[in-house]
Swiss-Prot record:
E.C. designation(s): 2.7.1.35
Similarity field: Belongs to the pyridoxine kinase family. PdxY subfamily.
Catalysed reactions, semicolon-separated: pyridoxal + ATP = pyridoxal 5'-phosphate + ADP + H(+)
UniProt name for this protein: Pyridoxal kinase PdxY
Length: 286
C-alpha cells in the first residue's frame, strides 16, 4: 500500500487542508501520514478563527522522528499545501530531501496555496515568493489555480492556449506534471469548471458543470483535488484517466454538499462516490 506524507493545514471544525484531503485519500486506498502546518478552529473564510501556526522546527522534528524509526523509506510521496510561513516552507523542502534520500523514487507534489483575499484565504508575507523561487524547482508535480499559475510564471493568462503554454514553461523549471486546478476566466465556458493537466509533451482539458452555492463557495476543493490526483497517479493511473476520476469524484462531493444544504465539504457522506463516481467526464487531449 502506498504512503503519503501530507503536510498541510488542519481545521478542527469543517474541511480544509488535511481535514479535506486526508479521509478521501485513505478511502481511495492509501496510507496518509498527516503533518499539520497550522491548527485552526475553522478555515479563514469565516472571518474569525483561533489556533496557531506550528513552529517550523515542529515539522522537522516530526519527520526526524519517522526517520529515527527507519520508516521514511516507506514514504512514496510528500504532498504539501497551505503553509503558515516561508520558514515552514524551507523545512518542508528539507523534509522532501530527507524522504528522497531514504526513497529516491518518492515524489513531491506541491499545492502552492498563495492566498486569495477575496475568498478569505490569507497567507503570510514571503509565502508566495517561497513557492515561486524554491518549491517550484523542487517539485515533481505542482497544482496551481489560475491566479497561482500567473504568480508562478509572472505572466497574464487569458485563454486555454496561453494556460497550456505557461504551464509548459513551469515544466521547464522543475515539475514534470502541472495541474491547473481552475481555469476560471481563461476557460472555454463561463458556466463550467475547467481544469488542465499539462506535461512537456501532452496536455488534457476537462470540464464539469459548476455547482451553485451562491456567493460563498466551499473551501477545500483544491486540497481535495490535489490529494485525489496524487493518489490516482501513485496507483499507476494514466494522466488522462486520473484527471477524469478526480473531476468526477470532486463533482460528486460538491453535489452531495449542495444536496445536504451544507457549506463544508461533505466528504464522509460522499465517500462511496469518491471511490466510484456516478457522473463521468472525459479528458480531451489538446
Amino acid at each position: 500500500m502506498k504512503n503519503i506524507l501530507s503536510i498541510q493545514s488542519h481545521v478542527v471544525f469543517g474541511h480544509a487542508g488535511n481535514s479535506a484531503a486526508e479521509f478521501p485519500m485513505r478511502r481511495m486506498g492509501v496510507n496518509v501520514w498527516p503533518l499539520n502546518t497550522v491548527q485552526f478552529s475553522n478555515h479563514t473564510q469565516y472571518g474569525h478563527w483561533t489556533g496557531c501556526v506550528m513552529p517550523a522546527s515542529h515539522l522537522t522534528d516530526i519527520v526526524q522522528g519517522i526517520a529515527d524509526i527507519d520508516r521514511l523509506k516507506d514514504c512514496d510521496a510528500v504532498l504539501s499545501g497551505y503553509i503558515g510561513s516561508p520558514e515552514q516552507g524551507s523545512h518542508i523542502l528539507a523534509a522532501v530531501a530527507q524522504v528522497k534520500q531514504a526513497n529516491p523514487d518518492a515524489w513531491y507534489f506541491c499545492d502552492p496555496v498563495m492566498g486569495h483575499p477575496e475568498k478569505g484565504c490569507i497567507v503570510a508575507p514571503g509565502v508566495a515568493e517561497f513557492f515561486c523561487n524554491e518549491a517550484l524547482p523542487a517539485s515533481d508535480m505542482i497544482a496551481p489555480n489560475l491566479l497561482e499559475l500567473e504568480q508562478l510564471s509572472g505572466e497574464r493568462v487569458e485563454n486555454v492556449e496561453q494556460a497550456v503554454q505557461v504551464a509548459r514553461s513551469l515544466c521547464a523549471r522543475g515539475p514534470k506534471v502541472v495541474l491547473v486546478k481552475h481555469l476560471s476566466r481563461a476557460g472555454y465556458h463561463a458556466d463550467c469548471f475547467e481544469m488542465l493537466l499539462v506535461t512537456a509533451d501532452d496536455a488534457w482539458h476537462i470540464s464539469r458543470p459548476l455547482v451553485d452555492f451562491g456567493k460563498r463557495q466551499p473551501v477545500g476543493v483544491g486540497d481535495l483535488t490535489s490529494g485525489l490526483l496524487l493518489v490516482n497517479l501513485l496507483k499507476g493511473e494514466p494522466l488522462d484517466k486520473a484527471l477524469e476520476h478526480v473531476t468526477a469524484a470532486v463533482y460528486e462531493v460538491m453535489l452531495k454538499t449542495q444536496e445536504m444544504g451544507e457549506y463544508e465539504l461533505q466528504v464522509v457522506a460522499a465517500q462511496e462516490t469518491i471511490v466510484t463516481p456516478i457522473c463521468q467526464f472525459t479528458a480531451v487531449r489538446l
